[in-house]
A protein has these predicted regions:
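Alpha-helix C-terminal capping segments
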Residues: 11-18, 33-34, 106
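Generic recognition of long tandem-repeat/solenoid scaffolds
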Residues: 12-16, 78, 143-145
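C-terminal catalytic lobe of FAD-dependent flavoproteins
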Residues: 113-189
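Helix N-terminus capping/helix-initiation residues
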Residues: 1-3, 92, 178
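Short hydrophobic core segments
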Residues: 17-29, 160
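Active-site substrate-recognition segment that forms the wall
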Residues: 26-140
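A conserved short coil-to-beta-strand element within the FAD-binding core of flavoproteins
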Residues: 1-15
Length: 189
């Protein structure tokens, strides 16, 4: 609960834990963060299916507008859908059927696959498809590392290294990810 944070100009305290800085990595919940809600987040919901088949699967991830990730024991993940509204974190049967329909031309044997799970998540997308990195314009001990959307697993390692250098060595952030690109147009006191 963000209301339980005690923030001063020199420290941040929460439940007896004190730190010099706090980094918000709160996904699509950033839109409710009182310090960073001004950033133009564009969350999007996505469905992913876990299936099981008796047929052989490829040895690598397959991309065909959607993706198929082979797992062990005939299991696989199939994803992902895009849904702008509603953002309710509830499995969408139409999205599941669309995922299946998209894969059947490439993997017709999956028509007989068993559906094990139907998971939903909300991606923290951004207006310009670039992440949000940096410090609050007025409170330098509040930082954000967010907005990686559907490319988090690809983008986070590289950006994490740049972010670490930013607040340990004072190296500049990549301008494409620095939240200063939005301060003039979106931040109000």
């Amino acid at each position: 609960d963000l209301s339980e944070l005690n923030i001063s100009s020199s420290f941040v305290e929460w439940h007896g834990h004190t730190a010099d800085k706090i980094i918000f990595c709160d996904g699509y919940h950033l839109q409710h963060n009182p310090w960073f809600s001004w950033l133009p987040l564009q969350p999007v919901q996505g469905d992913i299916l876990t299936l099981k088949t008796d047929h052989p699967l490829p040895n690598e991830i397959v991309q065909f507008g959607k993706w198929l990730l082979p797992l062990a024991n005939g299991q696989l993940k199939l994803g992902a859908s895009w849904q702008w509204q509603p953002l309710d974190e509830k499995p969408n049967e139409k999205a599941a059927l669309d995922l299946l329909d998209a894969c059947y031309p490439y993997f017709p044997h999956l028509r007989q696959a068993q559906r094990l799970e139907h998971n939903v998540g909300i991606r923290p997308g951004t207006r310009d498809k670039q992440p949000f990195l940096g410090q609050h314009p007025e409170q330098s001990n509040l930082l954000v590392f967010n907005g990686f959307g559907s490319k988090g697993s690809l983008l986070i390692p590289w950006h994490a290294e740049r972010f670490l250098r930013y607040f340990t060595r004072a190296e500049p952030l990549p301008t494409s990810a620095d939240i200063n690109r939005y301060t003039h147009d979106y931040f109000t006191r």
